[in-house]
């Protein structure tokens, strides 16, 4: 699952060097200035060791999102009319955003070809790092056509947490001239999270293991966003702090056994485009493994289903944390 993403994350995080480009916004003359003082919104990204500086003075009008997560981020900010297309839908769209999503042109089930991408005259692109690699459309080809590229920091850093995600939403809002709307959304998410945490403050913390898939040994979360958001609801990833400085990677069942999690959180791809086992099949696979029978989570049948989009950066995190908190701690949160 995340194996495809890890290589490009490394590329994006390589030390900045070589040429620096500045790309101006390509919005139409009728697009309002982003800031009252007319100053550009700026940011930088690094691709294959080359730093690129981007700047937009007017909000983009032909944006393309190359991942479901960034698509939902844009839709949450009401930017569907600024989107020329979307791609790589991995599961069902977040229900509150379905109507907005239906207004956006779908360019491809996965990544579009360069020709299809350019056919909608994009002036802005966003998505997971892989979207701008040789696996999809290399960043340099977009940059050559003066397409601004923005990568959420929460999708890059092994230190990313919910605050990183919130900052990404605010930056996206700033780029599109809707910063106040982004800030309002963030404030609402903070309020909801505070209510969740108030219900949990006197409860003991639980130990969890995140099971994505396996090939003899489990593919799991170690550090980064998934681990850090679970901490917010009193759930500690048993694979964190073991010296593996990666977000997702292959682990070992021996380590899981030694760590003895109370719950196993299972990524369910049953309705996605990924070729993985669904939730029930994964449970049966775990239960049929003789060496796992003494793990507390297995003995007590503590398996929790999640969708990938619920435990990775995007707009669903706080809603997912509410449900996960209820299941992990056995409480009802209004």
Give the predicted meaning of each segment:
Residues 62-120, 124-130, 238:
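A short, structured surface patch at a secondary-structure boundary
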Residues 2-12, 25-72, 175-210, 327-334:
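Bacterial Sec-exported substrate-binding components of ABC uptake systems
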Residues 67, 129-130, 154, 263, ...:
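Short secondary-structure boundary segments
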Residues 113-127, 252-267:
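Proline-aspartate-enriched helix->loop->beta-strand connector
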Residues 89-96, 219-248:
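Alpha-helical, coiled-coil/dimerization segments enriched in small aliphatic residues
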Residues 138-214, 240, 301-334:
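Extracytoplasmic substrate-binding proteins
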Residues 14-22:
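Bacterial N-terminal signal peptides
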Residues 46-51, 104-115, 243-251:
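Short helix-initiation/N-cap motifs at beta->coil->alpha
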